[in-house]
Design a protein with these regions (language model features):
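Non-catalytic alpha/beta scaffold blocks inside enzyme catalytic domains
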Residues: 1-156, 210-215
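Long, low-complexity segments enriched in small/aliphatic residues
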Residues: 143-215
Length: 215
């Protein structure tokens, strides 16, 4: 209901509406169809084996076998039965899509430590071991396949115009708004592994807890 009201207001003023998502890469995932109706909970419900691609903000109950592919020893790694160490996003080249749908080219800032591999290389090697070899064996080949399937991802720094699909306007429910993000400093495994971010989080919590005295 709130989104429908916002879309109605934007349309009446000839403005554009930008949705700020709460998870990195969500827009890119929607672009390539890597989404599940009902979210993560629905995706893993009843699963016997879960291949976790660095999803550390989801609770996985006991039962299924969990294979974790990620860069940091965060929540997902602690729940995993098998861990495949991968490069962090700063340690590999890639395409990113920002919240407005703009494809961006990213170059790695450094190499992954130890035996960690680039994410695409892990998936390609695993596909060969499973007898379902993916039809590319280089990053360039993968990128070509992505752009062939989704041409707009090849238009770097360009925003595709989407067809406006207004929602049915309903009266919002009588409920309080809640904060989607509780701690902006610790929203992902890389941030949670950072001493600097931990210090900033503690400082923010301290400021919020202290009452302000009138001058």
């Amino acid at each position: 209901a709130v989104l429908a009201q916002a879309m109605k207001a934007a349309g009446a003023r000839g403005a554009k509406l930008l949705v700020l998502h709460t998870a990195a890469a969500r827009v890119g995932a929607m672009d390539v169809g890597a989404v599940t109706e009902g979210g993560l909970a629905a995706a893993i419900e009843g699963a016997e084996v879960i291949y976790n691609l660095g999803a550390d903000e989801v609770d996985i109950a006991a039962g299924p076998l969990v294979i974790y592919q990620g860069s940091h020893g965060d929540r997902g790694a602690h729940r995993a039965d098998i861990i495949l160490p991968a490069a962090a996003w700063t340690e590999e080249n890639g395409l990113f899509v920002n919240t407005e749908g703009r494809p961006q080219l990213a170059l790695r800032a450094g190499f992954a430590p130890g035996e960690a591999k680039e994410n695409w290389a892990i998936l390609r090697a695993l596909s060969a071991e499973l007898g379902a070899t993916l039809p590319w064996d280089t990053l360039a080949g993968l990128r070509k396949a992505i752009v062939t399937a989704h041409p707009h991802l090849g238009r770097i720094d360009a925003v595709a115009e989407n067809v406006w699909q207004p929602l049915e306007v309903r009266a919002p429910a009588k409920a309080d708004f809640i904060r989607a993000v509780r701690d902006f400093y610790l929203t992902n495994p890389i941030a949670r592994a950072s001493q600097v971010m931990a210090e900033l989080s503690a400082m923010a919590a301290s400021r919020a807890a202290k009452p302000l005295a009138a001058e």
